[in-house]
From Swiss-Prot:
Pathway terms, separated by semicolons: Purine metabolism; IMP biosynthesis via de novo pathway; 5-amino-1-(5-phospho-D-ribosyl)imidazole from N(2)-formyl-N(1)-(5-phospho-D-ribosyl)glycinamide: step 2/2
Keyword field: ATP-binding, Cytoplasm, Ligase, Nucleotide-binding, Purine biosynthesis
MF annotations from Gene Ontology: ATP binding; phosphoribosylamine-glycine ligase activity; phosphoribosylformylglycinamidine cyclo-ligase activity
Lineage: Bacteria, Bacillati, Bacillota, Bacilli, Lactobacillales
GO biological process per UniProt: 'de novo' IMP biosynthetic process; adenine biosynthetic process
UniProt record similarity statement: Belongs to the AIR synthase family.
Chief location: cytoplasm
Gene: purM
InterPro entries tied to this protein: PurM-like_C_dom, PurM-like_C_sf, PurM-like_N, PurM-like_N_sf, PurM_cligase
Name recorded for this polypeptide: Phosphoribosylformylglycinamidine cyclo-ligase
């Protein structure tokens, strides 16, 4: 007992940590899927790969966080969607390689354990896992007084998925003449927030900017990142896509070239990009050069598909949403992305 009291005096509340574990169990249970072994609280999460039915399995992993979007979640005291952002950033990366997410682990570090707040965070992680079809099989909550302020926390995630070896998407199948199809983003997603926070530093978050169509600024800024797994998986299974790009930090300019070989380029028709109102607001209030917007943000397209012309109609049939035909693959002359 004296050892626990000594630890508590140093700022670590072990009892609060136990409460967090109990609170999150019901959220973890929502994410159960075939292949999960063991129970929450073991030393390691286990998954039976044979349950996937994949003949030649290749494991694909990804890890990410949500950057300084966390600072807005803390500022506006809204913590129930930031976990979805974390899941999205990881699973969207591995779906771009042709992998189906299998399981997810999260890491939360905080200055002071607040069981209610941390339950909200993990509830968002669980919601993201449900949307991605991934099991939340483990995680870590670290109370680190002195490292973080009492109200501060950081969040990171780790996703593991499986791809059929013959269906791996690595850019090698993308060719000149392929059509670039864009799937809409839900908003800013989880990149560029250091700039976003600077632009709106003097705003309360309750503003109804005319560009935002009646929505409060804080709600638009914290709109959770879209998860593309359920949209993309059927296309991968039917081998309809040659390349996939997750449009994250670096926007169009940095991410689209990751889809294909160095001798190719993407020609983008800017008029066909479904630019969301928040990006118009950022450009206006932040006095950002128009061309720079495409170097920073997703501009309304969160996932890019490179598709052979003969497969475009089938892709559109399978996707129960608007699909934006925004460009094509060309031979590279100079720049890897040409916006016209």
């Amino acid at each position: 007992m004296s050892e626990k009291n000594a630890y508590a005096k140093s700022g670590v509340d072990v009892e609060a940590g136990y409460e967090v574990v109990e609170r999150i169990k019901k959220h973890v249970a929502r994410t159960e899927r075939a292949g999960v072994m063991g129970v929450l609280g073991g030393f390691g999460g286990m998954f039976d790969l044979s349950k996937t039915g994949v003949k030649e399995p290749v494991l694909v992993s990804g890890t990410d966080g949500v950057g300084t979007k966390l600072m807005l979640a803390i500022k506006y005291d809204k913590h129930d969607t930031i976990g979805q952002d974390c899941v999205a950033m990881c699973v969207n990366d591995i779906i771009a390689a042709g992998a189906e997410p299998l399981y997810f682990l999260d890491y939360v570090a905080t200055g002071k354990n607040n069981p209610v707040k941390l339950e909200e965070v993990v509830s968002g992680v669980a919601e993201g896992c449900v949307q991605a079809g991934a099991a939340l099989i483990g995680g870590e909550t670290a109370e680190m007084p002195g490292m973080y302020g009492e109200d501060d926390y950081d969040l990171a995630g780790f996703a593991v998925g499986v791809a059929e070896k013959s269906q791996i998407i690595d850019g090698s199948k993308v060719k000149e003449g392929d059509i670039l199809l864009g799937l809409a983003s839900s908003g800013i997603h989880s990149n560029g927030y250091s700039l976003v926070r600077r632009v709106f530093a003097d705003y309360t978050g309750k503003e109804l900017l005319p560009e935002l169509e009646g929505k409060q600024l804080k709600d638009v800024l914290l709109e959770p990142t879209r998860i593309y797994v359920k949209a993309a998986l059927p296309l991968i299974k039917e081998e309809l896509v040659n390349g996939i790009g997750h449009i994250t930090g670096g926007g169009f300019i940095e991410n689209i070239p990751r889809m294909f070989a160095d001798d190719l380029a993407a020609e983008i028709d800017e008029d066909k990009v479904p630019v969301l109102p928040i990006f118009k607001a950022l450009e206006k209030y932040g006095d950002i050069k128009h061309e720079e917007m495409f170097e920073i943000f997703n501009m309304g397209v969160g996932l890019m598909l490179a598709v052979s012309p003969e497969n475009v109609n089938r892709v559109k049939e399978l996707l129960d949403e608007p699909v934006y035909e925004i460009g094509r693959i060309i031979k590279k002359a100079d720049d890897s992305v040409v916006i016209k």
